[in-house]
Regions:
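Membrane-interface transmembrane helices that cradle and orient dolichyl/undecaprenyl
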Residues: 2-19, 125-131
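Short hydrophobic alpha-helices at membrane interfaces in multi-pass membrane enzymes
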Residues: 10-27, 62-68, 137-144
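Membrane-interface alpha helices of multi-pass inner-membrane proteins
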Residues: 19-34, 72-77, 144-150
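Transmembrane catalytic cores of multi-pass membrane glycosyltransferases
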Residues: 34-133, 161
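Hydrophobic/aromatic-rich transmembrane helices and adjacent perimembrane loops
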Residues: 42, 149-177
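Membrane-proximal, lumen/periplasm-facing interface regions of secretory-pathway glyco-
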Residues: 181-232, 243-246, 250-251, 260-263, ...
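Short periplasmic/luminal acceptor-recognition loop of GT-C membrane glycosyltransferases, typified by
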Residues: 231-269, 293-301, 326
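Periplasmic/luminal catalytic loop of GT-C fold multi-pass membrane glycosyltransferases
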Residues: 269-322
């Protein structure tokens, strides 16, 4: 993400055409992580910035270049096993609506306690006010855009830290004479050995990691002990806590739900959440029978755990600080 955005911003700052050699990076990104759609979306404001800065006589040519680049970037993103379907996943995720509020990483920032995000944000605001920072209009739009994402959803907090410096680097360097002149040019032209060293280090670490076959999540944050101490996989369909779905996938056991919310849909996710929190107790009992649940794997704080302890058809067969397992009698 940083390489993609930084290279596009540099093209705008240096008033050059979009970097066509960057397109393979989009293909790689699309095959690694769903955030590639953010990279596609950012082409629009960056292209508008390029148009804004271009001379009037050059704007038509700049528009054609960035439009072609955007189309090729979309095509590059479609070079994955699922084609254009991967782009649609983002829209299905956003369409989950109220179900997103049940997932911690999709909730808004919580400012009831002072945290690192708030300290950094307030510090940046204080610096801007103290030094009288001014920015071009479209850079303001970009910074406010990532700030909005960072405030509205916890999972996007990193965007502000990763991308805001990229948006601000050239405007601040031009505004503050101590950073202007040759220093700006040097900042935009790093020595070749630095990225080369980083690439070699990445290849080396990846190669060493691939030789290990004992890599697994730590037991203190996963239901590993609960699963290995019981025969829960043989009990039948498992009703699991949302946070345990990924680990069940990891060990090859089918979960009731996992982090791929776009596959389950809003109604399914909300029903699961309301059932386990006993907001709808009758539906929780119906759910157990409807899906022929043979065992449950829940966190100790889940309200449904106390109810299962009292149901005659269920018995607790394992519990620790991480997970509680119930099975049908």
């Amino acid at each position: 993400m940083v390489a993609w955005i930084a290279t596009l911003i540099r093209a705008v700052d240096t008033r050059t055409s979009p970097p066509w050699l960057l397109l393979p990076l989009m293909t790689l990104w699309a095959n690694l992580h769903g955030s590639f759609t953010f990279g596609l979306a950012m082409i629009a404001p960056i292209a508008c910035d390029a148009l804004w800065r271009a001379a009037h006589s050059e704007r038509l040519n700049v528009f054609r270049q960035w439009t072609l680049f955007a189309l090729l970037a979309v095509g590059a993103a479609c070079l994955n096993p699922y084609g254009p379907e991967m782009i649609l996943v983002t829209f299905r995720t956003v369409a989950l609506g109220a179900a997103l509020t049940t997932v911690t990483e999709w909730r808004p920032q919580n400012f009831t306690h002072l945290g690192a995000f708030e300290v950094i944000m307030l510090g940046a605001f204080g610096f801007a006010l103290y030094r009288g920072v001014t920015l071009p209009v479209l850079r303001i739009v970009m910074v406010l855009g990532v700030l909005h994402l960072s405030l509205s959803q916890v999972r996007h907090a990193d965007l502000l830290g990763m991308l805001a410096p990229i948006f601000l680097a050239r405007p601040l360097a031009e505004q503050f004479t101590a950073l202007a002149g040759d220093r700006t040019g040097l900042a935009l032209r790093p020595s070749a050995w630095l990225p080369a060293t980083a690439v070699l280090l990445l290849i080396g670490v990846t190669g060493l990691a691939s030789l290990r076959h004992d890599v697994s999540p730590p037991a203190r944050i996963t239901p590993a002990n609960a699963i290995h101490s019981t025969e829960i996989a043989k009990a039948g369909p498992i009703l699991n806590d949302y946070d345990f779905g990924g680990y069940l996938d990891f060990v090859g056991t089918a979960p009731f739900i996992d982090g791929r919310g776009e596959l389950y849909g809003e109604a399914y996710m909300l029903r699961h959440n309301r059932a386990l929190s006993l907001e709808n107790l009758p539906d929780f009992l119906r759910l157990l029978d409807e899906y022929h649940i043979g065992a449950t794997l829940l966190t100790p704080s889940t309200p449904a755990v106390a109810l299962l302890d009292r149901l005659p058809d269920w018995k607790r067969i394992y519990s620790d600080d991480v997970a509680v397992v119930h099975a049908r009698r």
